[in-house]
């Protein structure tokens, strides 16, 4: 049954409140909640949100950015609430009715910067390529984006595949964002010889300094987690100077994920390295308590709610270590 916009907004508020309870709002999320709520309401499409991500920086002022994601199953032919869609109504309707590739769409809002009027829009590719890449970028209204994306994708090294792609029209140069998942064999080869990663980064067009790569990649590759890489392709077709390197945790029950944050756990070990690099303060410990996996009654049905860290991103820019962020995925599902 399709929920009203008020019902969806109330569910979002519950997901956020559970994560931010017991003082965690001040430590992790700051004062962004009202603007994030507004961004969520602008995003409402389809028959229900699949999940949201709270993108939480691990140093500096407490704040967060918001991602609102929709699986294909959530997008119907009459998909939009009045006034919602953040200007991407035609893109979402085309995707729901005409495009058979990809596994869903998502908005991304720079809430922490106070900027929600021009959100990014991404398509989750994940081994199901779009049939009409050109139409996606045309409806995303960024000139030349399809050409930039294709040129980058044609240079992907062995063992890489596009996980998601999209555009950030509100950022300087309206970059095309491409996230690449590295298969386990290639990832382990990087762990054995970091020069292979340096070679592959150069071959895909990343030309900026790699001075901080040994520290950042070394920390990630010493962990057991998967590896993703994020790139921005700029207006002139060049790959931008910022590189994202992410440890992908996968999805596990909250109790199991918490154990990874305990002393000796794989995430705790990784975060110890990140702390040594100066990219996080003690707030990362609060992420352990922000996660949950619970059920609750909601009228005549039962909801399962969860909030779990799905990956950690480390960024470098012009060769220098820049920052670290946790991405907390949260969702509510009806049971039975």
How would you describe each model-predicted region?
Residues 1-110:
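An N-terminal, globular interaction/scaffold subdomain
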Residues 20-27, 145-148, 206-209:
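Residue-level signal for secondary-structure boundary elements
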Residues 30-59, 100-108, 112-114, 156-166, ...:
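Short, compositionally biased low-complexity segments enriched in polar/charged residues
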Residues 56-61, 111-115, 167-174, 235-239, ...:
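Short, low-complexity cationic-aromatic patches
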Residues 64-72, 118-127, 172-188, 242-252, ...:
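Extracellular/lumenal glycan-associated surfaces
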Residues 71-97, 131-144, 185-207, 255-275, ...:
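Extended intrinsically disordered, low-complexity coil regions enriched in Ser, Thr, Gly, Ala
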Residues 85-197:
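Internal, hydrophobic cores of structured domains that mediate oligomerization or house catalytic pockets
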Residues 192-336:
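C-terminal structured domains
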């Amino acid at each position: 049954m399709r929920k009203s916009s008020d019902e969806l907004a109330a569910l979002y508020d519950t997901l956020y409140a559970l994560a931010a309870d017991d003082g965690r709002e001040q430590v992790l999320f700051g004062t962004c909640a009202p603007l994030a709520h507004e961004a969520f309401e602008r995003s409402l499409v389809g028959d229900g949100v699949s999940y949201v991500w709270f993108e939480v920086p691990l140093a500096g002022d407490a704040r967060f950015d918001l991602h609102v994601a929709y699986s294909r199953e959530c997008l119907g032919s009459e998909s939009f609430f009045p006034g919602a869609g953040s200007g991407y109504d035609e893109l979402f309707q085309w995707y729901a009715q005409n495009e058979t590739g990809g596994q869903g769409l998502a908005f991304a809002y720079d809430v922490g910067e106070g900027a929600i009027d021009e959100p990014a829009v991404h398509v989750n590719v994940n081994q199901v390529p779009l049939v009409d890449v050109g139409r996606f970028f045309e409806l995303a209204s960024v000139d030349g984006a399809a050409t930039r994306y294709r040129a980058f994708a044609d240079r992907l090294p062995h063992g890489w595949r596009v996980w998601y792609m999209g555009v950030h029209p509100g950022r300087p140069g309206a970059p095309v964002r491409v996230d690449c998942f590295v298969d386990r064999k290639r990832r382990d080869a990087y762990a054995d010889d970091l020069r292979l990663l340096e070679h592959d980064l150069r071959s895909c067009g990343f030309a900026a300094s790699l001075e901080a790569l040994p520290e950042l990649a070394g920390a990630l590759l010493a962990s057991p987690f998967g590896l993703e890489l994020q790139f921005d392709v700029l207006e002139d077709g060049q790959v931008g100077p910022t590189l994202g390197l992410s440890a992908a945790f996968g999805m596990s029950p909250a109790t199991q994920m918490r154990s990874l944050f305990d002393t000796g756990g794989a995430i705790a070990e990784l975060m110890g390295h990140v702390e040594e690099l100066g990219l996080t303060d003690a707030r990362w410990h609060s992420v352990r308590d922000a996660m949950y996996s619970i059920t609750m009654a909601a009228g005549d049905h039962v909801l399962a709610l969860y909030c779990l860290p799905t990956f950690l991103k480390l960024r470098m820019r012009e060769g220098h270590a820049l920052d670290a962020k946790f991405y907390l995925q949260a969702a509510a599902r009806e049971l039975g």
